[in-house]
């Protein structure tokens, strides 16, 4: 008799059937991942890979997880955000016998406990690959090893409420785990593929400091990720989150978007298409000029605070909306964030004010003067906290890149071509990912003749652009 599988923590395993139905629907909308299974499945390039995955536990991620398993990998999974888990997706993955530790609305204590549990491989041993979104799994090992090697002073100097919890976990691990626990993990990891801008910044910082422990592939800066997921994904999912959270009429409202990178561009377009009059703030003169040329009013947050009805942060930086900005806002202004972390808005400065929870991930905060503010997802990702995240089709492109990156680092690095540095996938794979998604939406490519290809100095089959080309 087979032992019952219990290596998971989900809200309700009874949601598995619902999750499986939605996974089936998503597979139809994720041609890149399904083609990857068909092409690479027989070769099993990830056989022997033990992947620790920290990425939003959604229906789309379930398709990614099952693709990795179909290619031979052994996987353990957590969500990279306390509000982004879709409980029926987590249940379906658990019911399939894949370890997953994720509950929508989990506490920060649970979040970090689940991250630690992800690294404790069932049957002994450690993971040998990381698939990360935001860099928390990567930081867990790097900072754990740093403390294990005797540099523990930083553990007594947390810079945020979350670091208080994270550093307490590291102290606990140092006491309870055998000596050399983090060193063993670090030694076994062959590489990490990183999904998002914030995590990529962390990787480049470590590379610059000479502390990066293993090769890393920056999936975020693949064109078929950043110019699609970040832009077109946000264009669809931002307004979905605001509407589900507030039920307000967006048409005619004044909206303020902080940041005009790819996420900001998609966010501004999302609000404009909903009928909002959109303002943008930027520190980069190039992005500011782009916003102005697109017809957006480019202002500062100080200018916008008393004018806008809706505020969205999309910068990847900290303290973008300060307590002073919030005090200057209209009564019941809506404030949310679509960057990876919750520090774009000074949430900590609001903790001593009156909070009224209206419904999950929607809070009304009252200031001493009686003015109120509507805060979505406590300043965390609004499109995943208040809605269902990006559509399956655009996530197929991102996750196909993730799968190819895992194959590169695990199966195609036997000659040691990947050092302890940050890389991007080659242009040929970027174009391959795009090509896999064309038929689904009825795109017919024009083909170059040989003489035309020679004329512009490319191969008939591509790549068609130089690495420095900006799409």
From Swiss-Prot:
<dbReference type="InterPro" id="IPR036291">
    <property type="entry name" value="NAD(P)-bd_dom_sf"/>
</dbReference>
<feature type="binding site">
    <location>
        <position position="229"/>
    </location>
    <ligand>
        <name>substrate</name>
    </ligand>
</feature>
<comment type="pathway">
    <text>Amino-acid biosynthesis; L-homocysteine biosynthesis; L-homocysteine from S-adenosyl-L-homocysteine: step 1/1.</text>
</comment>
<dbReference type="GO" id="GO:0033353">
    <property type="term" value="P:S-adenosylmethionine cycle"/>
</dbReference>
<dbReference type="Pfam" id="PF05221">
    <property type="entry name" value="AdoHcyase"/>
</dbReference>
<feature type="binding site">
    <location>
        <position position="230"/>
    </location>
    <ligand>
        <name>NAD(+)</name>
    </ligand>
</feature>
<dbReference type="GO" id="GO:0006730">
    <property type="term" value="P:one-carbon metabolic process"/>
</dbReference>
<dbReference type="GO" id="GO:0071269">
    <property type="term" value="P:L-homocysteine biosynthetic process"/>
</dbReference>
<feature type="binding site">
    <location>
        <position position="225"/>
    </location>
    <ligand>
        <name>substrate</name>
    </ligand>
</feature>
<keyword id="KW-0520">NAD</keyword>
<dbReference type="InterPro" id="IPR015878">
    <property type="entry name" value="Ado_hCys_hydrolase_NAD-bd"/>
</dbReference>
<feature type="binding site">
    <location>
        <position position="317"/>
    </location>
    <ligand>
        <name>NAD(+)</name>
    </ligand>
</feature>
<dbReference type="InterPro" id="IPR020082">
    <property type="entry name" value="S-Ado-L-homoCys_hydrolase_CS"/>
</dbReference>
<feature type="binding site">
    <location>
        <begin position="259"/>
        <end position="264"/>
    </location>
    <ligand>
        <name>NAD(+)</name>
    </ligand>
</feature>
<dbReference type="InterPro" id="IPR042172">
    <property type="entry name" value="Adenosylhomocyst_ase-like_sf"/>
</dbReference>
<dbReference type="GO" id="GO:0005829">
    <property type="term" value="C:cytosol"/>
</dbReference>
<feature type="binding site">
    <location>
        <begin position="338"/>
        <end position="340"/>
    </location>
    <ligand>
        <name>NAD(+)</name>
    </ligand>
</feature>
<feature type="binding site">
    <location>
        <position position="58"/>
    </location>
    <ligand>
        <name>substrate</name>
    </ligand>
</feature>
<feature type="binding site">
    <location>
        <position position="383"/>
    </location>
    <ligand>
        <name>NAD(+)</name>
    </ligand>
</feature>
<comment type="similarity">
    <text>Belongs to the adenosylhomocysteinase family.</text>
</comment>
<dbReference type="InterPro" id="IPR000043">
    <property type="entry name" value="Adenosylhomocysteinase-like"/>
</dbReference>
<feature type="binding site">
    <location>
        <position position="282"/>
    </location>
    <ligand>
        <name>NAD(+)</name>
    </ligand>
</feature>
<keyword id="KW-0378">Hydrolase</keyword>
<comment type="function">
    <text>May play a key role in the regulation of the intracellular concentration of adenosylhomocysteine.</text>
</comment>
<protein>
    <recommendedName>
        <fullName>Adenosylhomocysteinase</fullName>
        <ecNumber>3.13.2.1</ecNumber>
    </recommendedName>
</protein>
<dbReference type="Pfam" id="PF00670">
    <property type="entry name" value="AdoHcyase_NAD"/>
</dbReference>
<feature type="binding site">
    <location>
        <begin position="196"/>
        <end position="198"/>
    </location>
    <ligand>
        <name>NAD(+)</name>
    </ligand>
</feature>
<feature type="binding site">
    <location>
        <position position="133"/>
    </location>
    <ligand>
        <name>substrate</name>
    </ligand>
</feature>
<feature type="binding site">
    <location>
        <position position="195"/>
    </location>
    <ligand>
        <name>substrate</name>
    </ligand>
</feature>
<dbReference type="GO" id="GO:0004013">
    <property type="term" value="F:adenosylhomocysteinase activity"/>
</dbReference>
<keyword id="KW-0554">One-carbon metabolism</keyword>
<keyword id="KW-0963">Cytoplasm</keyword>
